Amino acid sequence: MGNDSVSYEYGDYSDLSDRPVDCLDGACLAIDPLRVAPLPLYAAIFLVGVPGNAMVAWVAGKVARRRVGATWLLHLAVADLLCCLSLPILAVPIARGGHWPYGAVGCRALPSIILLTMYASVLLLAALSADLCFLALGPAWWSTVQRACGVQVACGAAWTLALLLTVPSAIYRRLHQEHFPARLQCVVDYGGSSSTENAVTAIRFLFGFLGPLVAVASCHSALLCWAARRCRPLGTAIVVGFFVCWAPYHLLGLVLTVAAPNSALLARALRAEPLIVGLALAHSCLNPMLFLYFGRAQLRRSLPAACHWALRESQGQDESVDSKKSTSHDLVSEMEV
């Protein structure tokens, strides 16, 4: 794509001339249903994700020092909460027809923060799945002390890698003035370098989707084989939810990279971009919904009780030797994330 091309990241809502615009009567109609459709979705994600992740973060924060597994859920809930809190900021350019109101600094910072939280959530989920797998398989070297240290290191590594994945967003973003219709856009400009764009897309696809997907699917598959006699609906829901939310987003990135400039394929992909981004954002409210649904027996008592159930299920063997004997303390009984 050319200098004014946009990538599949947040805040990019530029139009191509893939549909007629009638300005003969002095009123240009530039409202595209596909571009305003994400607004109700963003509202639903915000209303569900903010209180849900806030509750999980609050409960996890209270017990994180005593329970190693709570650290995972604390970091995961914080990442998802920050992502959900950013939705009103993300919705404003959509509601204003693609006009960016936050200036040049906001153009570089705000989309990068959103990307940071989303990638951190994905990488933390993959690392948590690996931790659960280690606990279930029970390697001798994975003791409680080593696990506590390993969890802290893994959380830091997940945030660091997520930060590195967002660096191109901050480097290559700029404001672009359009004149028809008149609006200021926040776009990603690779300066016409297709090699740079291809490299960024490939790295994000591998480290932001394919790698975590393989890790999550492999670890939960191993857990299924390890305890084949029990039903594992939540583990399946985690893998399916991850794939459904993130696969379209990264496939769209590949399409935007390989599509020819001014092609019909590129135009359709850009029109669908806000809705597909919304689907990826929906993953930020998925985990609390899964906790509450599969912990609905405890939810009848109270909302914090359901969160405590999710935390207890993430502890595994470091809680007690009796954990393997009790279904209420069995890590693999529901493979909570």
From Swiss-Prot:
Functional summary from the UniProt entry: Receptor for the chemotactic and inflammatory C3a, C4a and C5a anaphylatoxin peptides and also for their dearginated forms ASP/C3adesArg, C4adesArg and C5adesArg respectively. Couples weakly to G(i)-mediated signaling pathways.
- Tissues where the protein occurs: Frontal cortex, hippocampus, hypothalamus, pons and liver.
- Major localization class: membrane
> In its UniProt entry, what is this protein called?
C5a anaphylatoxin chemotactic receptor 2
Q: Name one GO cellular component term.
A: basal plasma membrane
Which PANTHER family does the entry link to?
C5A ANAPHYLATOXIN CHEMOTACTIC RECEPTOR 2, CHEMOTACTIC RECEPTOR
Which family does the entry's similarity section mention?
Answer: Belongs to the G-protein coupled receptor 1 family.
State the annotated membrane topology for this chain. Multi-pass membrane protein
- TM spans (from-to): 39-61, 73-95, 115-137, 150-172, 203-225, 238-260, 275-294
Which residue positions carry a glycan here? N3
The listed locations are:
Cell membrane
Where does the record place the modification Phosphoserine?
S320
Q: How does it assemble?
A: Interacts with C3 (the anaphylatoxin peptide C3a and the adipogenic hormone ASP); the interaction occurs with higher affinity for ASP, enhancing the phosphorylation and activation of GPR77, recruitment of ARRB2 to the cell surface and endocytosis of GRP77.
Query: Which GO molecular function entries does the Swiss-Prot or TrEMBL record give?
Result: complement component C5a receptor activity; G protein-coupled receptor activity
Q: Which residues form the signal peptide?
A: none
| A Pfam family assignment | 7tm_1
Tell me which parts of the chain lie in the Extracellular compartment. Answer: 1-38, 96-114, 173-202, 261-274
Q: Name one GO biological process term.
A: regulation of interleukin-8 production
